[in-house]
């Protein structure tokens, strides 16, 4: 049935535990974050919600989010005074699924969570200690061998800027160009042995961040020196890349518009 009423665009910011899902995008072989969110929107709005939501990035299976952004349209719009009630209802329905909708705001019709993004920040967490992990399983990459973050920072400096990142690109990546500009990479280690790596860019190739982290880890543990790291970057060949870091340590932290 055609609805002869206007449709309003909305943006939501989402936090989720990616370990329970096949990824962000709708898939036939399992539960996706996109699918679970669409279910609760449909449950509230029925026929007034007719189009798939659009995410700022299609996070892979096991990848988490602290600030994923998405947009969708509702025919007839949402009463502004009911947004808080609506958030509470959605989060009640999503609570056991490991998903939380943090905020909702009205956007103009041209806003697109993916295409309108100016900057994305990904956070990668490494727990660098010999002892086993009790609290952060499926939340960090546990690396027992001590990593030299100073040499990792030198590698990160080489990755910063505009490059052909074919080395770090998944074979299934559909991006038209491997050229990307990394605006900033920061690496910090806290007292508990947790290393936090942040990557900032307008966009990334599929598995690019995890592949870069894998190479930086090789550098930090001494398997590679800076020369080998540079050769890998400049080769533009996937075969020269270290094994990608596991999905469990990766978080889509925030998206800027």
Language model features by range: what are they?
Residues 2-257:
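Structured-RNA-binding interfaces characteristic of tRNA pseudouridine synthases
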